[in-house]
């Protein structure tokens, strides 16, 4: 409808208006509405409290009756309770000189792990004592001689959330103890001292003695399924709610009005604007940038089927996503077909098209005649919608379904107001509740219901005269609560409450008054505050401001329907306020406004037309504000997250083409403001013409009077062209667009087919021409370059802290994401040229000489000219088109060069040319300098390195190894699709063929590899997954040693694509533990123990 219809006058149309006189035809409907509605609501509310079948898991050790280490990394870090009994004679294997290397009788973490003592339990020999250490606390200690004596019987240990206790049964405290003669025992309480468990490890071997026992109750509270009682209640609850809604519909039809079309008559027709919007959305589906959390959500969805529930895979100790996980469950089902990006995001594309259809077919006509008939309104609505959707909603996050849910909730409410019927209200409650629980940002959907309370109360009051209140309210109550059934279908009330309390305690859990952080990020020169995101939000705020201003000044925007337009404005304002209560403050949350942005754009377009805003001065001022918004938006980078940024123009700088765009737009703003001043002081008429304008002049005037439409479509064009240009400029190298288009042909493994892995860098070393291998690196000239001229610690510099990241600090207060194996160190044995530097990437010190310019104390100028190294033949160069030098230090790329020569030139001591290396990596850590072999003439047969360090600052130094030509294989070929991987959450969507490690019954699978994003991404996402947040990094760093493998991006050799790490267990022979499984029925209020929080 174009305008808001007045509710029918029921008292006139229906002579009998009392409840007592209701017709017999509606008496049954009333009874069904009351009974079914109330019972449906009760069953829905009771669903979280009904019992579930929980799968229990017990970790018992020894297994197979032997001292054999086993792996069992608990996703919740700790067991609900732990009981250990160790016969004293079991410690005999630690005594004697023959057992010097054996120190651990039993531990829950490998002793070699850096944080083993801080986090785990170790029963170990320390000098001549046997010590039980629990989370860095020596709980009980006894001399090993007494432990092996005749009086000692056993060591017992128990751990619960409130206390841990241990006792050497048979031993007493010594004469110098606080309580001489008392039992030798220790206890700690007042804190959760339960040790982290990643397995059971021992240095001993052979048969286990009788009485040795380790029993841990694994926390499997979320590994549950509904009991038959709960399943029956849920089915009955849904059926009763459906019956109540049917009864409500029957009561609605008592008004005597004919049935109205569910969809408008022109719903399926398309016009030119529709075609353009469809084309933009479909093309963006292939070439457009994705959101930062797509890999996070895809990995959760892929793992959930095997796990049995939708766990938060990367944080919060494996607690479930519920009550916000139902949308992810749909993605998990969708992933059964394919995990390729174009397939997984197909629902998002469908939501985008549906949003536009709802805006153009439902929203715009309801906003009034002026909006419905204005082409400027339609174009502005389309531009605003696309301007928000493209940068914020082209991924797997829940913002797209929330944006659609808000629109559908509003449309249902408007249909209820227009028809004076209550079934649309019930439907709005269902849609609103599903939207609310799609994600934390779903809280924005409550505005669609709140703004209609007044009209709906009037409808309820009128209809209650005939049917009473309860038959009308009960079905709505059932509709509002029925969403509890899918949300709590396999989980309990107590479990969800504890999970959400844990998330709030662990964080990030920012308060409402921290909302400024979201806007700080919006105005940073980063992907969070990119041109596209900043403009989307600023344009939305501008449209809201002008709509509110015109509504307040004139009562309503001329030509619009007052009720619907006020409600759409009210929803937007409430949504902004509701966003303050989300626990995190990221700019991608603004994606929930995509549908509202299109609706407000239509209103704003009408508000600034000549018919509504007659003053040319005011219209010109509005145009100036629009240009200023553009200028403010272009004062940022055209940046996107991770791989979406590859090849994008101005991705790391402000846009500039001969001159700065933001400066030019600011100057244009001033010119438009001067024009507004001229209209105010000189030509102060209202600009109306008496003569009939020509068709061309009318069209030109319409365009000029639509500055917001022009700006939004310019931004949409800028975004689409930028990402299309990125795909073209990158070709044949990898890009998002190329990968998605190739997926149509069946090549669905994404980046894994283009990342080239160098497993053995020693195989590609170039052979020296004349000098021995050990001396060739310094054979030409070596002044102040020495084999040990490298600091012991070359850890990469950390990035700066960013707003809101304080929740993600590691134990040292830094935000880092360094690549293990590249941070340096020293070795006990010297290498081939006497260097003790620890080399990265599996380089063999016995075959790899090292020279560096650093020295302790005062630095001196240093120069290096290596001997000549033989290049391979031209045919071999074509197969491996890259030359690499592993280097460390802080230096300018001009200070390290590669020179080439023919045999004759080298013999004469001359070179035929030189080039700089591309320095890809983080200083001063070890990294691979790259040079394309195509830049070396085909006649060249030899190369050498030249380094010049004239900077005497202690932090400025150079360390080099000999040149090599990598022998590479694709990551897909090396890692494959079978090995369990630790996929960082930024990379999940780019590697759809790799299998993320799973978890089941509270125990994680042990990964063999880890894939990280680029340096910026690794430093941003690694702290999210660490021990403090209950993520998988807190497990892998205790269980395995990570080593970075050299890798390169095909045809984009100078790109920091990310990193591949090999994960090697500290105990290579440890096998996955066998769990003792069982099933038990638990009530919805049952809790085994508090969840671990620190």
Curated annotation (Swiss-Prot):
Q: What Pfam families has UniProt attached to this entry?
A: Arabino_trans_C, Arabino_trans_N, Arabinose_trans
Enzyme Commission code(s) on record: 2.4.2.-
Which GO terms label this protein's molecular function in UniProt?
arabinosyltransferase activity
Query: What spans are recorded as compositionally biased (Low complexity)?
Result: 817-831
Q: Which InterPro entries match?
A: Arabino_trans_C (IPR032731), Arabino_trans_C_2 (IPR042486), Arabino_trans_central (IPR007680), Arabino_trans_N (IPR040920), EmbABC_dom1 (IPR027451)
Where is the protein localized?
Cell membrane
Where's it mainly located?
Answer: membrane
Instruction: Specify whether Transmembrane helix is a keyword of the entry.
Output: yes
Keyword list (alphabetical) reads: Antibiotic resistance, Cell membrane, Cell wall biogenesis/degradation, Glycosyltransferase, Membrane, Transferase, Transmembrane, Transmembrane helix
Q: Where is this region: Disordered?
A: 817-836
Any one of the GO BP annotations: response to antibiotic
TM region(s), chain numbering: 28-50, 232-251, 264-286, 341-360, 373-392, 431-453, 466-488, 530-552, 565-582, 586-608, 620-642, 657-679, 700-722
Q: Give the record's GO CC terms.
A: plasma membrane
**Topologically, how does it sit relative to the membrane?**
Multi-pass membrane protein
State its role: Arabinosyl transferase responsible for the polymerization of arabinose into the arabinan of arabinogalactan.
> According to its UniProt record, which protein family does this protein belong to?
Belongs to the emb family.
State the protein's name.
Probable arabinosyltransferase C
**Which organism does this record belong to?**
Mycobacterium tuberculosis (strain CDC 1551 / Oshkosh)
């Amino acid at each position: 409808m174009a305008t808001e219809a007045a509710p029918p006058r029921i008292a006139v149309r229906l002579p009998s208006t009392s409840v007592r006189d209701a017709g017999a035809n509606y008496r049954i409907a009333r009874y069904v509405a009351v009974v079914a509605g109330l019972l449906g609501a009760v069953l829905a509310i009771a669903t979280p409290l009904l019992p579930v079948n929980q799968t229990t898991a017990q970790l018992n050790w020894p297994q197979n009756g032997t001292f054999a280490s086993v792996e069992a990394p608990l996703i919740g870090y700790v067991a609900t309770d732990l009981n250990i009994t160790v016969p004293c004679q079991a410690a005999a294997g630690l005594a004697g000189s023959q057992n010097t290397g054996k120190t651990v009788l039993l531990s829950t973490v490998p002793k070699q792990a850096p944080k083993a003592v801080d986090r785990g339990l170790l029963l170990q020999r320390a000098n001549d004592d046997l010590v039980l250490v629990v989370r860095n606390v020596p709980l009980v200690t006894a001399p090993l001689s007494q432990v092996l004596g005749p009086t000692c019987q056993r060591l017992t240990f128990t751990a619960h959330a409130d206390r841990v206790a241990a006792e050497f049964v048979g031993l007493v405290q010594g004469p110098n103890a606080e309580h001489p003669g008392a039992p030798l025992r220790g206890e700690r309480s007042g804190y959760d001292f339960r040790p982290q468990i990643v397995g059971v490890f021992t240095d001993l071997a052979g048969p286990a003695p009788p009485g040795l026992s380790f029993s841990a109750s694994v926390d499997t509270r979320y590994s549950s399924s509904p009991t038959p009682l709960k399943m029956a209640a849920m089915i009955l609850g849904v059926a009763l709610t459906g019956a109540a809604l049917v009864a409500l519909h029957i009561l609605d039809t008592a008004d005597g009005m004919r049935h109205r079309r569910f969809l408008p008559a022109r719903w399926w027709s398309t016009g030119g604007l529709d075609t353009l919007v469809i084309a933009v959305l479909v093309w963006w589906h292939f070439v457009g940038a994705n959101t930062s959390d797509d890999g996070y959500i895809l990995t959760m969805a892929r793992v959930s089927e095997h796990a049995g529930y939708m766990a938060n895979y990367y944080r919060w100790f494996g607690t479930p996503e519920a009550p916000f996980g139902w949308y992810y469950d749909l993605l998990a089902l969708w992933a059964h077909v394919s995990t390729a990006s174009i397939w997984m995001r197909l629902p998002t594309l469908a939501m985008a098209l549906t949003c536009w259809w709802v805006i153009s077919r439902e929203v715009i006509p309801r906003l009034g005649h002026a909006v419905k008939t204005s082409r400027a309104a339609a174009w502005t609505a389309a531009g605003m919608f696309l301007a928000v959707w493209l940068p914020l909603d082209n991924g797997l996050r829940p913002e797209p379904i929330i944006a659609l849910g808000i629109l559908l909730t509003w449309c249902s409410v408007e249909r209820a107001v227009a028809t004076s019927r209550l079934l649309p209200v019930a439907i709005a409650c269902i849609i609103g509740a599903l939207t609310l629980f799609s994600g934390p940002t779903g809280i924005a959907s409550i505005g669609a219901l709140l703004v209609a309370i007044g009209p709906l109360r009037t409808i309820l009051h009128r209809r209650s005269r005939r049917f009473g209140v309860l038959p009308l309210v009960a079905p709505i109550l059932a509709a509002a609560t029925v969403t509890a059934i899918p949300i709590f279908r396999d989980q309990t009330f107590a479990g969800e409450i504890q999970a959400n309390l844990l998330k709030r305690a662990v964080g990030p859990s920012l308060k409402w008054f921290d909302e400024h952080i979201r806007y700080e990020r919006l105005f940073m020169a980063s992907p969070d505050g990119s041109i596209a995101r900043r403009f989307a939000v600023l344009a939305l705020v501008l449209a809201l401001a002008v709509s509110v201003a015109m509504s307040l000044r004139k009562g309503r925007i001329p030509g619009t329907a007052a009720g619907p337009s006020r409600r759409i404005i009210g929803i937007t304002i409430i949504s902004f306020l509701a966003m303050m209560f989300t626990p995190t403050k990221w700019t991608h949350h603004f994606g929930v406004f995509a549908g509202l942005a299109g609706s407000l754009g239509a209103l704003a377009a009408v508000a600034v037309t000549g018919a509504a805003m007659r003053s040319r001065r005011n219209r010109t001022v509005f145009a100036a504000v629009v240009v200023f918004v553009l200028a403010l938006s272009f004062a940022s980078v055209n940046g996107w997250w991770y791989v979406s940024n590859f090849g994008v123009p101005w991705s790391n700088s402000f846009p500039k083409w001969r001159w700065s765009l933001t400066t030019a737009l600011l100057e244009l703003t001033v010119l438009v403001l001067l024009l507004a001043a001229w209209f105010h002081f000189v030509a102060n008429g209202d600009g109306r013409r008496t003569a009939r304008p020509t068709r061309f002049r009318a069209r030109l005037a319409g365009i000029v009077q639509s500055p917001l439409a022009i700006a939004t479509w310019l931004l949409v064009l800028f975004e689409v062209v930028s990402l299309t240009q990125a795909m073209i400029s990158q070709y044949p190298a990898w890009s998002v667009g190329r990968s998605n288009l190739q997926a149509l042909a069946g090549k669905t493994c994404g980046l894994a087919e283009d990342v080239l892995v160098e497993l053995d860098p020693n195989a590609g070393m170039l052979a020296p021409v004349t000098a021995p291998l050990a001396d060739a690196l310094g054979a030409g000239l070596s002044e102040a370059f020495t084999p040990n001229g490298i600091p012991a610690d070359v850890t990469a510099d950390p990035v700066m802290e960013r707003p809101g990241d304080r929740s993600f600090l590691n134990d040292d207060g830094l935000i880092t994401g360094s690549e293990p194996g590249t941070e340096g160190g020293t070795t006990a044995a010297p290498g081939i040229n006497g260097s003790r530097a620890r080399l990265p990437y599996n380089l063999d010190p016995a075959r790899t000489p090292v020279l560096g310019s650093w020295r302790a104390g005062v630095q001196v100028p240093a120069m290096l000219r290596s001997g000549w190294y033989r290049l391979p033949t031209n045919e071999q160069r074509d197969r491996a088109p890259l030359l690499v030098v592993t280097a460390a230090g802080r230096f300018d790329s001009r200070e390290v060069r590669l020179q080439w020569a023919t045999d004759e030139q080298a013999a004469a001591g001359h070179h035929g040319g030189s080039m700089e290396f591309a320095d890809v990596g983080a200083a001063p850590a070890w990294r691979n300098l790259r040079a394309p072999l195509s830049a070396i003439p085909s006649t060249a047969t030899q190369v050498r390195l030249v380094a010049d360090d004239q900077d005497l600052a202690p932090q400025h130094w150079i360390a080099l190894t000999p040149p090599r030509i990598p022998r590479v294989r694709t990551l897909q070929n090396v890692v494959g699709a079978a090995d369990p991987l630790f996929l960082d959450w930024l990379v999940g969507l780019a590697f759809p063929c790799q299998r993320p490690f799973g978890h089941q019954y509270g125990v994680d699978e042990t990964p063999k590899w880890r894939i990280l994003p680029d340096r910026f991404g690794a430093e941003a996402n690694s702290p999210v997954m660490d021990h403090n947040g209950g993520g998988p990094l807190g497990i892998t760093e205790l269980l395995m040693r990570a080593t970075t493998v050299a890798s390169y991006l095909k045809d984009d050799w100078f790109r920091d694509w990310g990193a591949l790490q090999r994960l090697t267990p500290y105990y290579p022979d440890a096998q996955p533990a066998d769990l003792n499984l069982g099933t038990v029925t638990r009530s919805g209020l049952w809790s085994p123990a508090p969840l671990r929080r620190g």
